[in-house]
Amino acid sequence: MTELTIDVRGLTKAYGGRRVVDAVDMQVATGRIVGFLGPNGSGKTTSLRMLCGLLTPDAGEGRVLGLDFRREAAAVKRQVGYMTQKFGLYEDLSIRENLDFIARLFSMPDRRAAVDAALQRLGLATRQQQLAGALSGGWKQRLALAACLLHRPRLLLLDEPTAGVDPKARREFWDQIHRLAGEGITVLVSTHYMDEAERCHELVYIAYGSVLARGTAASIVAEAGARDLEDAFVRLVGRANDNFGQAG
């Protein structure tokens, strides 16, 4: 039987009477890379924040990493690495100081060794004294991922991690993601890039807070009767606009 890192049903969140996430079901098998796609404002970030325990859902039940994601949110947070859309570390601290600060937050007894390992893994060791604010987008991305990995999470939730990053840095980032998945770490990643979506094992497409399609890239293209993945999502968005837009 397949082990599920995420097994959640009916995930729901509303603001001002409008459901931004509407009864979303999410099942992600351990060690898989799942792409989370959809237009801006479709509910991706809100869903990720609920799954990692940062935001309380209005409804929904299930488990994340074997824990009740609502009742045991604090325990879930300790085992998840969450990378936000915007760079969230301290720009006036060095690379090493940022990582050391994160390690202290997690009360890691082997703090120095953990920081050294993260620096080596992400190719940051030779730059560790540089201020974070002086880094390019690609190097900031590496630092943010290093911070996510410090406490050895079993699940990574990545919110548009490569937005605004050059193609070479994006490719290197995805090579790293596949290495992590090979080590048994589960990855749920939101993206707008079709080439990145094709590197995922499975995809979930959301619009107006509801899941419109899920499956492999090939199965989604076939079911949509599309030429390629980009064409499939154009068709899905069009249908969503017709159905949900008129209802709104």
Regions found by a protein language model. Give the residues of each.
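Conserved ABC ATPase signature
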Residues: 92, 131-135
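Conserved catalytic motifs of ABC-family nucleotide-binding domains
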Residues: 152
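ABC ATPase "signature
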Residues: 214-215
